[in-house]
Amino acid sequence: MGAEILFYPTAIGWATDQDEETNKDQYNAWQTIQRSHAVANGVPVVSVNRVGFEQNGAMKFWGGSFVTNGQGKLLYLASHDKEEIEVVELDLNESDYFRKHWPFLRDRRIETYAPITKRFIDED
């Protein structure tokens, strides 16, 4: 069967002197890629991120931990500025449904993957 839930523990943030627009763009990109793991694999994703500041104050961690279902739907989103503990109930039977009705990875062409293991595609 494989994994039933994907967990991504992280400690990602930004320099405190970085502009707010860039900060938001980076957080949104991180959330998008994490949610895409749920879609690609058809299983819930739990992305946990550190919150607060590094001891020297030079880095602020995003917080914003979240949980999705197997289609990447946001089920829970934590605060960006305080520690939280949340229990989120997940229906693991949904994963079978998502995998059967939208088999995202079924149609991949793994026979075409070999070239990415080479530094240069024309290398023999």
For each predicted feature, which ranges?
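A structural signal for well-ordered alpha-helical scaffolds and beta->alpha junctions
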Residues: 27-31, 91, 117
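Generic detector of leucine side chains in alpha-helical contexts
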Residues: 6, 74-77, 90-92, 105, ...
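CN hydrolase (nitrilase-like) catalytic-core segments centered on the catalytic cysteine
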Residues: 1-85
